């Protein structure tokens, strides 16, 4: 769905950014018939700033992050939410590396973002992560409230499982063209 993916790979969300980059380099098109632009930044803060700028230009834009990366995105998240800009940040949730330097899955990172104004949508399996990513995208366009779509880092982000992929036609049916046009017109 998205036209721009601003990335700075951080474990356990690296796989999402790497796959987006791989698909773009292979010329795989989104539902609009375009190859999404993948912009790899020097930091998570840079990725969030790129998301903000791209959204302000009217592009459908996303990013993928986890733990400390999400913390560095918070200042831009306040701006994005305050401007009622549609966006989805996909977060492979894990503990923040503090005194214990833990990489175990928990929701410390996501809970630290509660006050940004982003809505939160959680997925508990690979299938749910696939399905809820689209629901978050469709809902952010309708509500003009940005979303954090999160799931357990490592347990879900690295799980290998068979899922039922949504077809481009199904995805297209979920995205309202008028809402996309309205998003673009606000730029």
Model-derived features: positions:
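Thiamine diphosphate
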Residues: 1-112, 117, 134, 153-154
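Conformationally flexible catalytic loops at phosphate/diphosphate-handling active centers
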Residues: 32, 36, 147-187
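Intrinsic-disorder/low-complexity, polar/charged segments
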Residues: 32, 43, 125-126, 187
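Arginine residue identity/basic-tract feature
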Residues: 79, 94, 114, 142-144, ...
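Conserved thiamine diphosphate
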Residues: 103-153, 165, 177-180
């Amino acid at each position: 769905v998205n036209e721009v993916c601003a990335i700075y790979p951080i474990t356990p969300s690296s796989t999402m950014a790497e796959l987006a980059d791989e698909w773009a380099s292979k010329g795989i098109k989104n539902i609009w018939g375009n190859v999404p632009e993948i912009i790899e930044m020097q930091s998570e803060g840079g990725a969030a700033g790129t998301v903000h700028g791209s959204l302000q230009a009217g592009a459908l834009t996303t990013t993928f992050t986890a733990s400390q990366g999400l913390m560095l995105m918070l200042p831009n998240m306040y701006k994005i939410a305050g401007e009622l800009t549609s966006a989805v940040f996909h977060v492979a949730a894990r503990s923040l590396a503090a005194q214990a330097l833990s990489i175990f899955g928990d929701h410390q990172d996501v809970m630290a973002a509660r006050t940004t104004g982003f809505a939160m949508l959680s997925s508990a399996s690979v299938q749910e992560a696939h399905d809820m990513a689209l629901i978050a995208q469709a809902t952010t366009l309708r509500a003009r409230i940005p979303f954090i779509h999160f799931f357990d880092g490592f347990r879900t982000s690295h799980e290998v499982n068979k899922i039922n992929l949504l077809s481009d036609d199904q995805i297209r049916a979920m995205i309202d063209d008028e809402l996309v046009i309205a998003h673009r017109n606000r730029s």
